[in-house]
Amino acid sequence: SVFSNALNGFVAKLSDDELLRLQKDADVVAIEQDTLVVLQGDQLNPPWGLDRIDQRDVLRDSRYSYNETGAGVSAYIIDTGILPTHSDFGGRVGSGFTAISDSYGSGDCHGHGSHVAGTVGGSTYGVAKAVSLIPVSVLSCAGSGATSGVIRGIDWVIAHHESGVPAVANMSLGGGVSASLNAAVTRGIDDGVVFVVAAGNNNRLACSYSPASTPNAITVGATGSNDARASFSNYGSCVDVFAPGVSILSVGITSSSSTRTMSG
């Protein structure tokens, strides 16, 4: 793969001699070994809703009040894909992109991406109930994928984002620190896309992970219904905000009306 938007770079299998020659090339800024990134989220019960985020007070009022619907905004879900036929999406799922070589395209055979999309923009479970949802599939049915595949997804987002159109990208995934992945996210931000990324589920410093350590991304940690940091959530100076992330009810993929509860 060759990157031309998120990075000026490429993916290649190199011999030791080829690697040495590239390391000595003054035009090469950095070389990284491709690594594995994984989903941020585990299935838990019971669920709780949107009630917490529309008020500062921890005491919930059994209502989710909002002034904006996200209409006219593109939300790129960089994840496992989205089930476009789910009723909660109301036909607002675009064709998107896949970096995964399987028969699902930008559809979802894992469920995490659809759950995230439902949390972002589902009509019942979502925050922005009229946003346009665009699947960017970079993780497999097993919930993992190469860092280079994630960068390919970001590269596609940058290439297809229309200048002046409000857009956000969600990345509920992560791996070890990658300068290349962080640089790709930064390039996307510079292009006008707001990147919201998971702090991670390792109960460690978020600065030790990517894309959580990207300086200008909005890095989000997880809290439970008691407003305390979730036991699994990463923490530290790289975390910009905490939000509900324990036992979240959203879209499932077993049918066009199914639900699923996940944490992360």
Give the ranges of each region predicted by the language model.
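Short, well-structured alpha-helical segments in soluble
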Residues: 153-163
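Autoinhibitory propeptides
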Residues: 1-49
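A short glycine-threonine-serine/GTX helix/turn-capping micro-motif
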Residues: 257-264
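Catalytic-core segments of hydrolase enzymes
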Residues: 116, 162-255
